Each structure stands twice: as structure tokens, then as C-alpha cells.
Amino acid sequence: MAGELSIGAELPTSPLAMEYVNDFDLMKFDVKKEPLGRNDRSGRHCTRLQPAGSVSSTPISTPCSSVPSSPSFSPTEQKTHLEDLYWMANSYQQMNPEALNLTPEDAVEALIGSHQVSQQLQGFESFRAHHHHHHHHHQHHHQYPAVTHEDLAGSGHPHHHHHHHHQASPTPSTSSSSSQQLQTSHQQHPPSSSVEDRFSDDQLVSMSVRELNRHLRGFTKDEVIRLKQKRRTLKNRGYAQSCRYKRVQQKHHLENEKTQLIQQVEQLKQEVTRLARERDAYKLKCEKLASNGFREAGSTSDNPSSPEFFM
């Protein structure tokens, strides 16, 4: 911040404001040193302080170089607001130069509206007390006097990280509520006597192993073993019943075939008996014909009309 302050084109062009600004030579003012008591309250022990006569943007290589000494807030001094603006721009540029980029023109612009600085100081002092209480576990504490809430809007990244840290670590109330939910979910499971009654026999037999395991999630190991043994017993019983049914069906089929074969045998026997009777009848007839023909041949042997006569 060393150098001559120049009033840019963005400053007010009213003659009263320009005349008010030109009455001040900003480089003649020094930055007041912080008493050691304020550093002890903020948790910092510094052995070297910033020299009284230097207004420089380069931080001094001390253990507290990231937090420069703040000016005193005495309402009786005439240089208070100007020193506050210098200290604010210097300290916040060292700690977070990207969040608040104050230039000498910004300081002069803020000096023109210096009648609002007292209200801003009161508002930010209450905000800084709340901010210090909220971040008491951090390694270092930030103090930004005379900076409004709008100026701190750019430095939302550290607070965002802090909120994420709070979200990552569950509070004891959250952990206790989760444990209560787990206990409630365990209490909602029926006892071991009703676990077996939860599924019917048909459901246990028809259900696949994967589906049964999905339904048995959350139950104890003994309950799962007992239910699977029941399912295995029902499966074996069903298999035995199926085998018995198949054997009965096969027996009935064989009995029907046997009955049909017996009937066919009886029919064949009857057919054989009928054919035997026909055979006997034809045999008797043949014998009768043979005897009758022999007699006729003996009686007509002298007849010339017989074939033997011509031979």
C-alpha cells in the first residue's frame, strides 16, 4: 500500500466531497500498535510487533505476521476511522488477498462515507464475537474489524469447509437416534415362533433359495437355520409324496395293462376252443366222406362206365 493515493474516476465528483478528501494527506498517518494484552486474549504470543512508522503491504516475518496488530478503538482520537481503514485493508489482504482486494481508492471511498463507519463497527463487533465463539476449536482466530457482512461474503470457502466438517462428524444425539432406530428395527422383527409361521408351507417349497435369503435378512442365525431345516423337510416330504404318487400311478397303469392282457388271453383261449371244435367237426365229416366213398367204389367196380374199365 506504499505510494501516493490517487483518486480514480469512480470517486464522487461533487465539489464538497473532493474538497473534503483533498484536505487529508493519508500517508502522514501511522498505524497504531496493538497492546500485548489484546494479543494474549486472542491466543497469540508475539515477540516482535510491527514498527510504528511503517505502512507497508509486505507482512513482517514474525510468528503473528498473518494477523497484524489492530488499532485501538478510542472515540476521542480524530484519526480512528482512517487508521481502521488502513489496518483493515492491510490485515485482510495478508490473510486472504483474494477475498477482499482493498486499494487506496477503496479506502478513500470508504472515508467519504465515514459517518456510517461507527454503525458498521458496532454491527461487526457483535458478528466477530459470535464468529469467535463458533470457531473456538480452530487453530487460529480471524478478526476483521470495520468489515461488514457483505465484505465477508467472498470468504465463504473456509466456513463452507467448516460446515462440511460438522456434517461429517455425527453428534451424540444423531448417533443415539440411529441406535434407537436400529433397536426399533430389531424389535419390529417377529419372535422365533412367528418366523416359521410367517411363510406358509407352499411358499417355502415354491420359493427359490435367493428369494428366501432376501426375506430372511435381519433375523438371527438360529431362526434362519430352523426355517431352512423346515423348508428342507417340506421339500423331502414333497419329493417322497411325489415319488409315492408316481409309484401308485405306475401300479395302476400296470394293473390296467394286466387286466387287459388277461382279457385278451381269455379271448384267445375262447378262440382256440372254437377253432378246436371246428377242427373236430371237419375231421368227423372228412372221415364220413372217406367211408362213404370206399363203399361206393366197391359196388360199382364191374360197371364199364368207370374209368378203370376203359383202361
From Swiss-Prot:
The keyword Lipoprotein does not apply. Coiled coil: none annotated. Residues 226-289 form the bZIP domain. The keyword Transport does not apply. One of its GO terms (cellular component) is nucleus. Its main location: nucleus. It is found in: Nucleus. It holds the Pfam family bZIP_Maf. GO terms for biological process: regulation of DNA-templated transcription; regulation of myeloid cell differentiation; regulation of transcription by RNA polymerase II. Residues 35-78, 150-199 are annotated as: Disordered. It comes from Gallus gallus. Residues 54-76, 168-194 have a biased composition (Low complexity). Keywords: Activator, DNA-binding, Nucleus, Repressor, Transcription, Transcription regulation. Gene3D superfamilies: 1.20.5.170. Belongs to the bZIP family. Maf subfamily. Expressed in brain, thymus, gut, lung, mesenterium, spleen, kidney, ovary and bursa. GO terms for molecular function: DNA-binding transcription factor activity, RNA polymerase II-specific; RNA polymerase II cis-regulatory region sequence-specific DNA binding. Residues 254-275 are annotated as: Leucine-zipper. It comes from the Eukaryota. This is Transcription factor MafB. Residues 226-251 are annotated as: Basic motif. Homodimer or heterodimer with other bHLH-Zip transcription factors. Binds DNA as a homodimer or heterodimer. Self-associates; the interaction requires the intact MAFB leucine-zipper domain. Interacts with FOS, HOXD12 and PRRX1. Acts as a transcriptional activator or repressor. Positively regulates the expression of alpha-A crystallin genes during lens fiber cell differentiation. Binds to Maf recognition elements (MARE).
